Amino acid sequence: MNKPKRGVVFAALLAIVLLAGAVCALHWVNAVSLRGTANLTAYTLTDGAAQNLVPVMEDPWVDRGVLHIRGALLRLDQPVGEVKVRVGLIPERIEDGNAQQAATLLNTQMERRYELAQEYGCDDHCGFHASVAEKYLEKGNVQYCVVLVDETDGAKRMITTGMTVTLIEGGLAFVQKNAPEEEAQHAR
């Protein structure tokens, strides 16, 4: 019986490792890429209160050149009801205060949030985690208003979150968001 030569085995293993590395790199590029834009005129801009929707935002962070935004959109109108949202950023130039007419959409993954479901009595399919590479966003004189683009049940709405983000070289320069007491007050 012929034994395979070490060189052939090594080459096959190297090819598998390189292929796995390429697949991982493609997944990473996909995860931090933009997902297009949403025209503001096609959506109703709301804070969610009239629809019994409560945005809960966690502090965003930058890690290895990627901006991460995590939070949840609570549906208080029914105990069971999945939320499917995308995170959007509306750029506003700080010097003139002019906002763009479109929200830049981020890659958004939905996640379960058991602790929020128990606290507010909503479905646990309410969480999200969005990410984008910093290189796709302007830095310095642009402030981004974070919105949640919700098309659940055929509705087309952008829900304001009370959070704004400004990027500088090396991280976040400014983050403003509603205090937890305001979010809890909004939920009642």
Regions found by a protein language model. Name each.
Residues 6-188:
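Basic, ligand-binding patches in group-transfer machinery
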